[in-house]
Amino acid sequence: MKSFIVALCVVGCVLANDPEAVVVRNDYVQNPEGSYNYAFESNNGISGQAEGKFKVFDKDSAAVVVAGSSQYKGSDGKVYSLTYVADENGYQPQADFLPTPPPTVAIPEYIARAVAYNLAHSAKV
């Protein structure tokens, strides 16, 4: 029985693995001023691209701002796509499959009045 379970696990692992992916496209350009772009694609449906541009924010700060996307085919057969921007506001991914925060709820009027009252009548420290 144990050998059957081990054999079943081995067969499951072999069937679960995709064949080794082959890169069918790989483009990359690096410019002297710091900007770049790249794109890649493999034969198993994984692909991505990005473009980075050097951006001066003010006289003391500058950075490379990046915009890009990627996609892959999940084990469920669905294609998952993600786009993103990375700039002075941080990394900002967007995709249908990413979790979203709960909706904001308005503060009830009685709570707002209580907070206003407490602020107006609190002791100054």
Curated annotation (Swiss-Prot):
One of its GO terms (molecular function) is structural constituent of chitin-based larval cuticle. InterPro entries: CHIT_BIND_RR_consensus, Cuticle_Struct_Prot, Insect_cuticle. Pfam families: Chitin_bind_4 (PF00379). The keyword Chloroplast does not apply. Coiled coil: none annotated. This is Larval cuticle protein LCP-14. It comes from the Eukaryota. Component of the cuticle of the larva of tobacco hornworm. Residues 33-102 form the Chitin-binding type R&R domain. Residues 1-16 form the signal peptide. One of its GO terms (cellular component) is chitin-based extracellular matrix. The keyword Transferase does not apply. It comes from Manduca sexta. Keywords: Cuticle, Signal.
